[in-house]
């Protein structure tokens, strides 16, 4: 009887390890791909959403700049971690032709302000309370889009990214330095 209990306990531990390993693999499944290139001339749909103070913002306000739009939710812990790397990348890139916007899926009253303050997030965080931006093709959170100064979607990232990693900084700098589409899978050296 004791051996059956030990075998059952070992099976639970092995199952737990397998689930954890599988989860971690899914987070890093596309590390080799920094971003998915979009077909040319796919126009980003305009939106009008409020920030935490109630001020309204629309995508059109950022026309003329490259814009990273990051979709996230409070219930997504990896989303909150990604936001800090996005803030750091924004500071490292320090480019007047770059804007970052985060769009929270849901109500602003669920502790968002404290998370933003705690993590030093300075870029605009908007609220999609009615979840009206579903047409953006967001399979999971976080998902981000890189929009050109002309308003076309150039790239999409699905899942978490370490935006302040050397590879992502180089990738973004290449986008900022050129109006030509950049290869979405540069060879990491």
Spell out what each predicted region is:
Residues 11-22:
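Bacterial N-terminal signal peptides
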Residues 28-59:
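N-terminal "domain-start" segment that seeds a small globular fold
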Residues 63, 71-88:
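Conserved redox-active cysteine motifs that mediate thiol-disulfide chemistry
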Residues 66-67, 142:
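Alpha/beta-hydrolase fold active-site loops
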Residues 80-119, 130-135:
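Structural microenvironment flanking redox-active thiols in thiol-disulfide oxidoreductases
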Residues 114-121, 127-174:
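Thiol/disulfide oxidoreductase modules built on the thioredoxin-like
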Residues 178-189:
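Non-globular targeting/processing and membrane-anchoring segments
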């Amino acid at each position: 009887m004791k051996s059956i209990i030990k075998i059952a306990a070992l099976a639970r531990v092995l199952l737990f390890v397998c689930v954890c390993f599988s989860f971690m693999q899914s987070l890093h499944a596309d590390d080799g791909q920094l971003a998915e290139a979009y077909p040319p001339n796919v126009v980003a749909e305009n939106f009008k959403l409020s920030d935490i103070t109630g001020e309204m913002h629309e995508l059109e306000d950022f026309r003329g700049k490259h814009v990273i739009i990051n979709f996230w939710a409070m219930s997504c812990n990896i989303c909150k971690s990604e936001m800090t790397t996005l803030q750091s990348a924004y500071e490292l890139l320090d480019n007047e032709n770059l804007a970052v916007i985060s769009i929270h899926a849901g109500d602003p009253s669920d502790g968002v302000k404290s998370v933003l303050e705690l993590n030093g997030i300075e870029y605009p965080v908007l609220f999609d309370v009615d979840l009206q931006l579903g047409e953006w093709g967001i399979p999971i959170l976080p998902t981000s889009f890189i929009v050109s100064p002309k308003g076309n979607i150039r790239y999409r990232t699905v899942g978490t990214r370490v935006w302040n990693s050397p590879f992502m900084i180089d990738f973004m700098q290449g986008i900022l330095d050129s109006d030509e589409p950049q290869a979405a899978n540069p060879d990491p050296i």
